[in-house]
Amino acid sequence: MSSFSDALWLGVQYAFFFVLAGVARSSFVFRLADRPLFWALLLGGLSGQWQPALSLGIVVELLWLDVIALGSVVPPFGTLAFLLLFPLSIIPGWSEAHQFLAPLMFAVFAAYGASYAERYQRVALNPLVDLVTAWFTSGRGCTPGQAVALGTVVRAAWQFSLYMLCYVALWLACDLLGEAIFLFEGQMGWPVLLAASMVGGILSLRTRRAYACLTGMFVAVCGFLAVTRLDMF
């Protein structure tokens, strides 16, 4: 793989994309930018890596089909999963489905972790409502504009930090494991991975039980793959 400095600089650029996706996620003006396929089309055009961009975008999009918000559970960050995976098509230049399988599992858990982090971040920002209320009643506290600005800065900071943490962890794992991270080499193509991603039909229910079902499935698959790899050695 390329040097750590090159990979880190690429990660910083994609962290800013993730921040922009977060802004779109919390607005009603341009919600399309919160969808993985939007970033697949945009970054595929900018980089020229159309094949991995569209393939990854469709896979991640199918994992979360719940375009319409239903239920009270904070939806996972599908854009985080895509923006973690796509740089691997640039550094180190992967393009085959089996190369992305193990990183995809990590990216899915990262997307769910980000949704839980967002929930706690929303709770942490709740005191801003009291400050705005105090400003209206007594003139003390902060104005609505100040509250929005502070909330935006806090949100951007935690999204940037979260992306860089996940990106560095994924890049180091890929760098240390090398080709050992490739699963089912020569046995899995993009059509198989696209079919497997149809599990998004479960996630579209957006209930805790559906999420627990997916988590259990991934744990079972990871356990099976771990045993298979051990048997190979």
Task: Report the location of each language-model feature.
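Hydrophobic alpha-helical transmembrane segments
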Residues: A21-V23, G44-G48, W64-V67, S89-G93, ...
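Central hydrophobic cores of alpha-helical transmembrane segments
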Residues: L56-V60, A81-L83, A212-F224
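Hydrophobic transmembrane alpha-helices
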Residues: S2-P75, T79-L80
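Helix-coil boundary and interhelical linker segments in multi-pass alpha-helical membrane proteins
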Residues: M1-V12, L43-L54, L88-F106, L176-E179, ...
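Helix-loop-helix junctions within the multi-pass membrane cores of secondary transporters/permeases
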Residues: F100-F182, L194-A196
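Juxtamembrane boundary at the C-terminal end of a transmembrane helix
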Residues: C222-F233
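Short helix-perturbing small/polar motifs within transmembrane alpha-helices
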Residues: Y14-G22, L65-I68, L80-N126
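Alpha-helical transmembrane segments and their immediate juxtamembrane interface regions
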Residues: E179-V219
